[in-house]
Amino acid sequence: MSVISMKQLLEAGVHFGHQTRRWNPKMKPYIFTERNGIHVIDLQKTVKLVDDAYNYVKNASQEGAVVLFVGTKKQAAEAVKEEALRAGQYYVNHRWLGGMLTNWNTIQTRVTRLKEINKMEEEGTFEVLPKKEVVLLNKERERLEKFIGGIADMPRIPDVMYIVDPHAEQIAVKEAKTLGIPVVAMVDTNADPEPIDVVIPANDDAIRAVKLITAKMADAIIEGRQGEDAAEDFVAEEAASEESLEELAEIVEGK
């Protein structure tokens, strides 16, 4: 039973890759065909690999894993934050700061500072400070919240990372590899799949595609933590239907 259907993938545009001239040859096993200068991802493989990723994340969640969602480009930022929070996990959805994981202790000093500023406001300190100082503190807090707010309560270095577009998030991938953190990722046709532990071949530039796959990873965490009935919008499909395959063929033929 698959957790995602061919129809869902088609409707979200998961099959559209990059221009052929921008491809990474290592993605060849995941490419169905090429049409009008664009690579088309093999969705039959994507269905299977989403299942693999779902089970991997679910099993990690059952063991109490801390999962970090990463996606800093505009197409991914909102979904990464929303789905990480829905799953009770953590996220980075603005620029990845070099050393965010490999320099964990230094990053924690900034987390402490963010919490200090929040505490000052909660305790009424802002009310007795000069307005100019409050303005500066709010600016500092806004910047800290933007870059590290999503990991402020993360109890430790993550056990698993889910990344949207490892090509754009190469620093995050390198840090994960340095620390031995397994990476699950949406990998488009322009990226190198080799550093990724669990590859999900998919269009990582379409908001709907990113939302669909990212939501499934959140569902996996929730199911792992709470049981089979907890994940939202669970869709089961024995295999890709002939109708879906015909629809894909029509799309790539431009009909």
UniProtKB/Swiss-Prot annotation:
In terms of superkingdom, the source organism counts as Bacteria
Q: Which gene encodes it?
A: rpsB
Q: By what name is this protein known?
A: Small ribosomal subunit protein uS2
**Which UniProt keywords are present, listed alphabetically?**
Ribonucleoprotein, Ribosomal protein
Q: Name one GO biological process term.
A: translation
Where is the segment annotated Disordered? Answer: 233-255
GO MF annotation list: structural constituent of ribosome
Cite the PROSITE patterns for this sequence: RIBOSOMAL_S2_1 (PS00962)
Q: Which Pfam families match?
A: Ribosomal_S2
Would the keyword Ribonucleoprotein turn up in this protein's UniProt record? Answer: yes
What family is reported? Belongs to the universal ribosomal protein uS2 family.
NCBIfam families assigned to the protein according to its UniProt record, in alphabetical order? rpsB_bact (TIGR01011)
InterPro entries in alphabetical order: Ribosomal_uS2 (IPR001865), Ribosomal_uS2_bac/mit/plastid (IPR005706), Ribosomal_uS2_CS (IPR018130), Ribosomal_uS2_flav_dom_sf (IPR023591)
Q: What GO terms fall under cellular component here?
A: cytosolic small ribosomal subunit
State if Cytoplasm is listed as a keyword. no
